Amino acid sequence: NKRQLGGISGFPKMSESEYDSFGTGHSSTSISAALGMAIAADLNGEEGRQSVAVIGDGSMTGGMAFEALNNAGAHKNNLLIILNDNNMAIDPNVGGLNDYLLDVATSKTYNKLKNDVWHILGKFNRISPGMRRFIQNIDNSIKSILLKQSNLFEAMGLRYFGPVDGHDVNHLVKILRDLQKIKGPKLLH
C-alpha cells in the first residue's frame, strides 16, 4: 500500500509516523537533516547522542547531499551516514560518483583482504582503542594502495568504513555497535 491512494508515503512524513522527525519529498535531504540534528544535540549538551542519515547511492548524486557531506566534514559533529549502495534508483545511476562507488565496492583484492583481517580480529574478544586506531591506519593505507582513487569521503573530512555486506546482519549489527564508540562524522558504505 506504499505510494497508493490512501497508502503510506515513500518519504518521511511527520503526520504518518512519530518517528519521522521531518517531512521531505526527496532523500538527498537526509544528510542535511541528520547533520542539523547532530548540531542541535551538541548545542543542547546531549553528548552521547548519535544522529544517523540513511541515503541511497542514487540520492547521493544530488547536490544537497554533497553540500551536507562538505558541512559534516567541517563541523565534526557526531553523525553516522549509512550509504545504501544497492545500485538502484528510479533511473540508472550515471556519472563520476557512480563510477567511484563501483570502483570502491568492487575491488576484489581489497575486499578479500579486509574480510580476512576482520575475520581474524573477530576471534578476539576485546581490542584496545590504540590497536583499533593502528588497524584503521593499516586499512586506510591498504585502501589507498589498492583503489584507483583516494577516498572521496575521507577527503571531505569523514571517517570512511566499508564497503560492508549489508546482507550479513550479524556482522552489520557488530559494525554499527562499534561505530557508536567513534566520535565525529563517519560514513558506512
Residue ranges and their predicted role:
Residues 7-10, 21, 26, 30, ...:
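Residue-level preference for alpha-helix termini and adjacent loops
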Residues 1-5, 74-89, 109-112:
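A glycine-rich helix N-cap at a beta->alpha junction
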Residues 1-75:
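Cofactor-binding active-site loop characterized by glycine-rich and histidine/acidic residues
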Residues 31-38, 69-70, 80, 150, ...:
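Predominant activation on well-ordered alpha-helical scaffold segments within soluble catalytic domains
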Residues 87-189:
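Long, well-ordered, tryptophan-enriched scaffold segments
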Residues 62-84, 100-105:
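A short alpha/beta connector and helix-capping loop motif
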